């Protein structure tokens, strides 16, 4: 049997690449071939799913504290992961998030790099 493991991350647990590799390992142990593909919906995990080396830029986080956000050039196109500049994890998480005081200015700064 041939299996295709095309998966996104398990939020807070494993990256898309780790999930695909775990499925691939289980398939191999069961005697099946598996093609592993890490996917992303464009948010958190996008750059990891693309693979390769990222560049980073220091930008304003959603609550004003500077954060390091990744980006890269992929086949002549700049790819950013908005979650690294303005996502919930850099906005204090679900417990400390301040939607009315937060800003996505850091995403704009990342685009301007």
Set out the residue ranges of the language-model regions.
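N-terminal loops that bind phosphate or other acidic moieties
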Residues: 1-113
């Amino acid at each position: 049997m041939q299996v295709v493991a095309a998966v996104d991350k398990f939020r807070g647990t494993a990256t898309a690449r780790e999930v695909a590799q775990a499925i691939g390992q289980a398939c191999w142990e069961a005697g099946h071939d598996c093609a592993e593909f890490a996917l992303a919906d464009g948010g958190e995990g996008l750059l990891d799913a693309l693979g390769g080396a990222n560049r980073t830029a220091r930008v304003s986080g959603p609550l004003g504290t500077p954060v390091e956000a990744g980006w890269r050039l992929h086949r002549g196109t700049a790819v950013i992961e908005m979650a690294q500049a303005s996502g919930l994890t850099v906005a204090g998480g679900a417990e400390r998030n301040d939607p009315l005081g937060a800003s996505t200015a850091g995403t704009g700064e990342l685009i301007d790099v």
